[in-house]
Amino acid sequence: ICVDESGSMLDSVIHSAIMAGIFARLPMLDTRLVIFDTNVVDLSGHVEDPVETLMSVQLGGGTNIAGALSYCETLIDNPHRTLVVLISDLYEGGGYHNLYSVSRSIIESGARLIALTALDMTATPNYDRHAAAQLAQMGAFVGAMTPEQLAEHVADMVG
């Protein structure tokens, strides 16, 4: 789970924490937790309670999604059994070319890339729709979902 903690995600912190919590509680998954702004922080040692962890850590600042996904790519051992879950508004500060390049690399490895877009406190989607369309065109699953919708989607994917 790769969670955008940049300044633009401030209104989505609660949503992001709940979404990360859904994946962390799935017993069939070995879950890693990575947060990022322009820096990447691996919080995999705190994945048992991602809601508390994400609510207590707020990085803020800029956004380097490509850098975070590049780090996550190094964690992939078995691509065909790997879900890379990105929770972000997809507003990339480090250049969209790099974001698309690393996303394509993850997808072409056989791993599944899931981009869960930001929802604010009223569940209104707030994300870069062009970036979302580009990722979807590459084969990533891109969705603006409530936690209930996500739980159903993940159950269908892994079940």
Segments and roles (model prediction):
Residues D4:
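Residues that scaffold, gate, or flank divalent-cation-dependent active/transport sites
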Residues G7-G159:
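Acidic, glycine-rich A-domain
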